[in-house]
């Protein structure tokens, strides 16, 4: 079992944990429909960068 050699001070503990926060994923707005979607992903309507690239059930 691992045993620490020296106690980590509160300051060093905070510095160690400084990158453990969660970040919201960046989103983009589709210019044709105005819907938000993940960047570099197809919008729910099947549009990507202003072009229809996927048929959806609503199209049929």
UniProtKB/Swiss-Prot annotation:
Q: Is DNA damage among this UniProt entry's keywords?
A: no
Q: Name one GO biological process term.
A: translation
The record, for InterPro entries, names: Ribosomal_bL32, Ribosomal_bL32_bact, Ribosomal_zn-bd
Q: Where is the composition biased (Basic residues)?
A: 49-60
Q: Which UniProt keywords apply?
A: Ribonucleoprotein, Ribosomal protein
Cellular component (GO) terms are: large ribosomal subunit
Presence of the UniProt keyword Ribosomal protein in the record: yes
PANTHER family on file: 50S RIBOSOMAL PROTEIN L32, LARGE RIBOSOMAL SUBUNIT PROTEIN BL32
Q: Which HAMAP family match?
A: Ribosomal_bL32 (MF_00340)
Question: What's the protein called, per UniProt?
Answer: Large ribosomal subunit protein bL32
The scientific name of the source species is Bordetella petrii (strain ATCC BAA-461 / DSM 12804 / CCUG 43448)
């Amino acid at each position: 079992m691992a045993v620490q050699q020296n106690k980590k001070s509160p300051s060093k503990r905070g510095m160690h944990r400084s990158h453990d926060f969660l970040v919201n994923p960046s989103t983009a707005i589709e210019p044709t429909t105005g819907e938000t979607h993940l960047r570099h992903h197809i919008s729910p309507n099947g549009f990507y960068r202003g072009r229809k690239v996927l048929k959806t059930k609503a199209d049929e």
